[in-house]
Design a protein with these regions (language model features):
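Terminal leader/tail segments of proteins
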Residues: 1-9, 13-126
Length: 126
């Protein structure tokens, strides 16, 4: 069973991710964003970043491609309703393809509990 992690931007639910991938030693989880009722994720993030002065690392308006540093107002919630703790989430993607979130600063304790499947997979590779 996959776990859905709810994403909110400035207090508004925008969708979820399943955090399909992780780099446990680095405290990073990442995955595809599934948007709910968002016509243009590019416009959503571009407007948000301009409004809140969040640094954009790549912006190609013609392709509607954007990448950002950590967005402080982007919150991730666990199934129990608690907010995922860490440094925060950055996004990248384009409207015609997909968007991904990379969440950094996950503690080793949280990696061992919430993301134990990723930790197990990592340990089996060594």
């Amino acid at each position: 069973m996959r776990i859905k992690y709810i994403l909110e931007l400035d207090g508004v639910k925008i969708g979820y991710t399943e955090f399909e991938y992780a780099d446990p030693p680095m405290g990073v989880v990442h995955g595809k964003i599934i948007f709910e009722e968002i016509d243009s994720p590019y416009d959503l993030f571009k407007n948000h970043c301009k409004k809140f002065n969040v640094e954009i690392t790549a912006d190609l308006p013609k392709d509607q491609l954007i990448a950002t540093y950590i967005i402080p107002q982007l919150k991730v919630f666990l199934q129990n309703g608690n907010q995922l703790q860490g440094w925060g989430g950055a996004i990248e993607g384009m409207d015609s393809d997909e968007f991904k979130i990379e969440f950094s600063g996950v503690s080793s304790e949280l990696m061992q509990t919430e993301f134990r499947h990723h930790l197990k997979k990592y340990n089996e590779q060594e």
